[in-house]
């Protein structure tokens, strides 16, 4: 019976826009067993991909509203589902595995969970989640790399931050997972920046607006790629990603998933006359899009994700970030609902 509830949960997760593809080894079931108790799996599998009032859910699962709310709130504290409250009424929905349940597993991330995640991603999980479009995340450029008159409103990371009311930092689940399997990353662990839209997010450490702005500068300085949810409005976080740990960038560098992240509407160019061949840009590029030819750096535009780290770090200004021509610009979905609808359509699913 307990195995059956995990099968039900896996199927429910795969019907969400993000997807939770099955594998030939069934490692995804072991993964769910590690994270959810049988009761939690049963409850989660009976939720939908839309926010519903607790009364509706309670009737469906055969519990009183009070008992259902107590159990669901406790699950929400551990990131096992999504929760919202309007006035005195509670709403819940099934959370995607990625981005959702997985990112909330910082406290439970141990050697076993880390290896299960790695096996799942490497054996079809990453491809099944990252290949469907629109992508989960999109790249936004380093602030110092783009002239203000060229930056698009939804690509302005500082403007996104300043429109929020509260701020927090938390550890990066990707680096935490990689550390457990023996990969030591040189970048800091606490690099995920959260805004007011996700103020209930577990494991977040509250910081001030000034600290958040300073952190964005620091992330760019040390060479981390800004990525956000692939929407124009309602952005709740900025991930600061490295190519060795970040799942979506590893999609490009390790698993051959070229569209695992939506590229920024910019591309890097390096002036061969100005380049002194110091290699700083090659070291800062997280997706290996820059190589050396005849003593100078050259950008492979097909690989360039437009993050601008080469331009912001070039000691003599040889590397620059340019906006793509108008016919190459790609606008992200307006909001999360539009993103979900487009993704469901592209996966041949409906709500």
Question: Where on the chain are the PLM-derived regions?
Answer:
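Glycine-centered, phosphate/nucleic-acid-interacting loop/turn motifs that mediate DNA/RNA or nucleotide
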Residues: 79, 223, 279, 288, ...
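Flanking helices and flexible, charged tails adjoining ferredoxin-like Fe-S electron-transfer domains
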Residues: 301-351
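Short, amphipathic alpha-helical interaction segments positioned at domain boundaries
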Residues: 89-126
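Short acidic, hydrophobic short linear motifs in intrinsically disordered regions
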Residues: 50-61
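A short, conserved structural fragment
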Residues: 76-87, 290-291, 319-320
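Ferredoxin-like iron-sulfur electron-transfer modules
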Residues: 94, 227-235, 255-306, 324-327
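Catalytic cores of enzyme domains
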Residues: 124-267
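Basic amphipathic alpha-helical segments that dock to polyanions
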Residues: 57, 68-79, 219, 241
């Amino acid at each position: 019976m307990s195995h059956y509830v995990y099968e039900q949960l896996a199927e429910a997760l795969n019907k969400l826009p993000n997807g939770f593809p099955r594998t030939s080894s069934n490692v995804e079931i072991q993964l769910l067993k590690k994270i959810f108790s049988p009761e939690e799996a049963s409850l989660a599998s009976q939720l939908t991909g839309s926010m519903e009032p607790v009364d509706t859910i309670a009737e469906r699962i055969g519990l009183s509203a009070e008992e259902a709310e107590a159990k669901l709130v406790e699950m929400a504290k551990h990131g096992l589902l999504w929760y919202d409250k309007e006035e005195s009424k509670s709403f819940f929905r099934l959370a995607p595995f990625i981005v959702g349940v997985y990112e909330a597993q910082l406290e439970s991330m141990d050697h076993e969970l880390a290896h299960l995640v790695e096996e799942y991603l490497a054996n079809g999980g990453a491809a099944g989640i990252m290949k469907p479009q629109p992508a989960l995340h999109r790249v936004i450029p380093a602030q110092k790399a783009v002239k203000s008159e060229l930056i698009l409103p939804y690509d302005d990371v500082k403007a996104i931050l300043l429109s929020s009311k509260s701020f927090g930092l938390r550890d990066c689940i990707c680096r935490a997972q990689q550390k457990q399997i023996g990969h030591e990353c040189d970048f800091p662990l606490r690099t995920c920046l959260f805004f007011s839209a996700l103020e209930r997010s577990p494991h977040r450490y509250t910081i001030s607006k000034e600290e958040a702005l300073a952190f964005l500068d620091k992330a760019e300085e040390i060479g981390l790629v800004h990525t956000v949810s692939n929407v124009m409005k309602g952005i709740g976080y900025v991930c600061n990603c490295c190519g060795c740990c970040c799942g979506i960038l590893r999609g490009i560098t390790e698993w051959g998933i070229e569209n695992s992240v939506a590229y920024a509407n910019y591309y890097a160019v390096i002036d061969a006359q100005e380049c002194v061949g110091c290699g700083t840009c090659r070291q800062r590029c997280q997706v290996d899009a820059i190589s050396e030819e005849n003593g100078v750096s050259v950008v492979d535009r097909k690989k360039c994700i437009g993050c601008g780290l080469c331009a912001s770090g070039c000691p003599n200004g040889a590397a620059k970030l340019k906006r793509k021509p108008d016919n190459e610009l790609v606008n992200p979905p307006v909001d999360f609902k539009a993103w979900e609808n487009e993704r469901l359509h592209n996966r041949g699913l409906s709500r």
